[in-house]
Amino acid sequence: MPLKLKALGASDTLNAAVNKSLAAFITFFMTPFISFRSDRHRGKTGRRIPFLRWSTPFVGLFMVLMGFSDSFAALLSGTSQVFQIAGLTITKPVLTLILISIFLVGFDFTSSYVNTLFWYLINDVVPQKTMSRFIAMFKIIGFLAVMLFNKYIFPSSLDHFRLIFAVSGAAYVIGFMIMCFTVKEGEYPPPPSGEQPGFIPAIKTYWRERFSHRIYMLVFMTSVFYLLLSASSNFAILRNTAALGLSMKDVGNMNFYTGIVNLAVLFPAAWLADRFHPLRTFLWGLIAYFVLHLFQCVWIFKDFGEANLSLLYMFTIAQNCIMAILMTSEIPMYMRIFPRAQYGQFCGANAMIRTLFFIPGSILAGYCFDMLHKFTGPGDWQYRYYPLWTAVVILPGIFFAFSLRREWKRLGGASDFRPPEQVPPCGL
């Protein structure tokens, strides 16, 4: 999608806003509501699957519609490249951008249900002592799909945009619906009784339960800065292609071959998380990620010509190893710290706090690259600053992760930690 928007003439700021901030804005409003209602829902098929069944088909539908945005724009504009709508002069690429944005709103709205409740379902049905290894196996399957995509589809993704989105939407619906009709949820205790009905009392309950202890606030802030690492991720592909001069085929092949390394290290990384506790391994991963991106800043000062590809292979292999640790530690870390009965609501609060920072953060990332373009002059040298953004953003994340580890140890650590329940508020 970033390449498609770039081809349509979108600025870096608009690219970041459409791809990142729009989804974050919808997440801010939807995730707490979904989490609160799902945790308290008791249906014949459980508390997660009923929501997944109705939302999944709409996710696939909007994926297909996004793929056909060009066709809809051509249908509305005919053969004209410039035309009038409601008194406004609009070009065909701008109309395509508008349609993509509209369909993306629908996609983000419906996928907020699936993306949220899928992880809650995993927490409900998978034993916690093997959670990291389960997530590793889940990621391995995902990476196999990504590797095949990068090898055989990515190099021509702009040429077959419609077909890719149509097939992806259909596969998405089929895969998730199979899961919904085969996975069985267990029994849950009844929802909390004695709560006042109504929207305002629900908000008060939600706020009191989610933000009542220091350790939860530290989890939220650690998660915020980890998420902000992805605020500029759209520009990684632009760094590799536009700035470093690599072809789409080069990047696709690199992602395929380095993905093999990812597959090899995911399960050992998950074993480390289960063995030493995911909070510890997550902190190690953040520190290593910071150091790696400092080294990648070398491209700000020097271009290595044909050696760029070899150097990028080295950095990507190292990054995949570190990301394996982070990916197999993040979700299990939340599952070990948040109360299990209210896990969805705590994740909803986490998503809400993350979004408050991510919306301005992603727009700021795009704006920074637009401003850098003015200072770096002609060409696309500004994208070489992508790892600098990552290095700067990750420092507060390391600080909060250290503070989280200290609070976790104070509350019992690996041997005796119990998620705090109703306690007096405690700030950072």
Language model features: what each stretch is:
Residues 47-50, 86, 154-170, 369-394:
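A membrane-interface helix-boundary motif in multi-pass transporters
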